[in-house]
Amino acid sequence: RGICAIPYVRQRDNATVYFPVNIIGNLYVSNGMSAGNTPAEARTQALSEIFERYAKFRIISEGLCLPDVPQAVINRYPRIAAGIQGLRDAGFGILVKDASMGGQFPVMNVTLLNPQDQGCFARFGAHPRFEVALERALTELLQGRALDALGGFPAPGFDLEEVASSPNIEIHFVDSSGVIHWNFLGDQPDFPFHDWNFSGTTAEDYQWSVNAIQAMGRDIYVADFQHLGVYACRVLVPGMSEIYPVDELEWENNSIANPIREAILNLSDLDHDECSDLMET
């Protein structure tokens, strides 16, 4: 029947490349999807999400320790500082960290430590503007949760292999409730603090994001969508924006049931032997 594929435009040379829908659904899921008032705004948000998850997964899986953000820097943003202080006043330990990995990525981290159950809950936010990235990390921490629902997260672990395992990383993608390695809470950061800010106009934010990813040797592919006057896009960066490992295509492929689809759609027409074969399958 052929392969269902969607055209994407490679930003490096404007070449059109077709990506099979099955590969997108298996490996990238919702990562890099965005809508906005303008193409530049939506694409910047999509790339920011890709930056966030790429940095987050590397930091968690490699057990990296991030530098703290000085209080003087946090105080530049009174609303954010007040939100952080409010959580501390409620009895939670709040760590604010620079997740740019040495100024490479526009990513920030806010981590909550619950003294009641020793749970550790780390959230990340990304945007070329430092303030927006920090605010996103803080709001992600409380997204869909009241203060009395900030318990039940796992305590940090010592087994880096477990922390870096695909099931744990998958949980971090779903709701960030996976295990964090104790190294993350250490006092010897793997990178110095960078007081970064890569922001300019919306168009400049997008161009900076593109340049940063292409400087890593990665290609950016964009599919544009318009519906009822609203612009949306989906961005893929092979080697960077995958949520699931390529092995998923072999072991957990969404198309695994294709050979029995016809039988399922015609159950009433199957004879006894065909029903038995389908059940065994």
Describe each PLM feature range:
Residues 1-281:
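Helix-biased "structured C-terminal domain" signature
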